[in-house]
Curated annotation (Swiss-Prot):
The UniProt record lists the keyword Transmembrane helix: no
Pfam family, one: Cys_Met_Meta_PP
Organism encoding this protein: Haemophilus influenzae (strain ATCC 51907 / DSM 11121 / KW20 / Rd)
UniProt GO MF annotations: cysteine-S-conjugate beta-lyase activity; pyridoxal phosphate binding
Cofactor: pyridoxal 5'-phosphate
GO annotation (BP), single: L-cysteine catabolic process to pyruvate
Gene: metC
Described purpose of this protein according to its UniProt entry: Catalyzes the cleavage of cystathionine to homocysteine, pyruvate and ammonia during methionine biosynthesis.
One CC-aspect GO term: cytoplasm
Protein name: Cystathionine beta-lyase
Subunit structure: Homotetramer.
Pathway named in the protein's UniProt entry: Amino-acid biosynthesis; L-methionine biosynthesis via de novo pathway; L-homocysteine from L-cystathionine: step 1/1
Length: 396
């Protein structure tokens, strides 16, 4: 497909070539382990092109997988896309593809908690050194790069506290010291389209497709879209690690992407309205929504992102007691308590300052009030605000 089209058009038409759709609107759902060859010559041809979208063996993918991979590459401008069973698998296998014993990794100190645990447990067991940096470090990232630094891992915005790093400055400073460093980003919040990672000289853009790509909280999948420099190594290492996703999940993810454009617009509109309302409430100390000036790195968001999604957090003026947490959290009518996000439904979680400090031992944010994370779904926004208002009344 021609890349001159707007994203909203591309979401609809990419990954729907006749080879994938066989004449139907959607790509076919092809479930297969064994894929049949008509002749020795056919088998030889498939073997030679097994990494290039040729049907070879189920673990390499079927037409269903190829259609989604084509769509993802079109979306994010990559040379290739690998599919994983969840977002964490995409993160961990992307890192593992480029490190060995004795190497060094630079990891955001505000990254997703399981990503940090992977570094502290698995990578350290492999005798790979980790240095955690403050996502607001900017050009000083250069001072942390060592001769054996192989991977620089970014996340934008940061998990829970929502900082937006100065990504172009960080990338430029890192490349100046080590042009060959592999730079990857957890790009889930932007759905890979609100921030175009590969256009900012990042090598690999990773998503928990479980969230916005699927969009309905019913499938788990991870994606990693790589540039030409890193694609072959990422693909082969991930394949050797046995990473794959079933055809049904790939099919459902591609179907979810068809409505991604309209969903992101609604997430943005509703979340900003809720965030602005929260910023005016006496119970709220600070709102950490990248689109609001109160969020650290807001100026970088305005410069580098084309829009926002539905996830943000806000700090209360007080640390809630255990009794207050229950009163506040247990009685919402529209907000549900759950991990993950990115679906059509609104979600809420509460973290205490000491809990944030525990999962962020390498950076300090000096939170004093309870930190509430919300994902704003597609309910009527005034009714969501009323639900939050009732929550504040319960802890008054």
């Amino acid at each position: 497909m021609q890349t001159k089209y707007d994203l909203s058009t591309m979401f609809i038409h990419s990954g729907r070539q006749k080879r994938f759709s066989q004449g139907s609107v959607n790509p076919v759902l092809q479930r297969a382990s064994s894929l049949l060859f008509d002749s020795i010559e056919d088998k030889k041809h498939a073997t030679q092109r097994r990494a290039k979208g040729e049907l070879f063996y189920g673990r390499r993918g079927t037409l269903t997988h190829f259609a989604l991979q084509d769509l993802m590459c079109e979306m994010e401008g990559g040379a290739g896309c690998y599919l994983y069973p969840c977002g964490t698998a995409a993160v961990t296998n992307s890192i593992l593809s480029f490190v060995k014993t004795g190497d060094h990794v630079l990891m955001s100190g505000a990254a997703y908690e399981p990503t940090q645990y992977f570094c502290n447990i698995v990578l350290k067991k492999m005798q790979i050194d980790i240095t955690y940096y403050d996502p607001l470090i900017g050009e000083d990232i250069a001072t942390l790069i060592q001769p054996n630094t192989k991977v620089l891992f970014l996340e934008a915005p940061s998990s829970i506290t929502m900082e937006i790093p100065d990504i172009p400055t960080i990338v430029k400073a890192a490349r100046k010291v080590n042009p060959n460093i592999v730079i990857m980003i957890d790009n889930t919040w932007s759905a890979g389209v609100l921030f175009k990672a590969l256009e900012h000289d990042i090598d690999i853009s990773i998503q928990a497709g479980t969230k916005y790509l699927v969009g309905h909280s019913d499938i788990m999948i991870g994606t990693a879209v790589a540039n030409a420099r890193t694609w072959d190594q990422l693909r082969e290492h991930s394949y050797l690690m046995g990473q794959m996703v079933d055809a049904d999940s790939a099919y459902t993810t591609a179907r979810g992407i068809r409505t991604l454009g309209v969903r992101l617009k609604q997430h943005q509109e509703s979340s900003i309205k809720v965030a602005k309302w929260l910023s005016e409430q006496p119970e709220v100390k600070t709102v950490y929504h990248p689109a609001l000036p109160s969020c650290p790195g807001h100026e970088f968001f305005l410069r580098d992102f084309s829009g926002s999604s539905g996830l943000f957090s806000f700090e209360l003026t007080q640390r809630l007691t255990s009794e207050q947490v229950s009163k506040f959290m247990d009685h919402f009518q529209l907000f549900a308590m759950a991990y993950s996000w990115g679906g059509f439904e609104s979600l809420i979680l509460c973290n205490q300052p000491e809990e944030i400090a525990h999962i962020r031992p390498n950076i300090k944010r000096n939170l004093t009030g309870s930190l509430i994370r919300v994902h704003i779904g597609f309910e009527n926004v005034d009714e969501l605000i009323a639900d939050l208002k009732a929550g504040f009344e319960r802890i008054a």
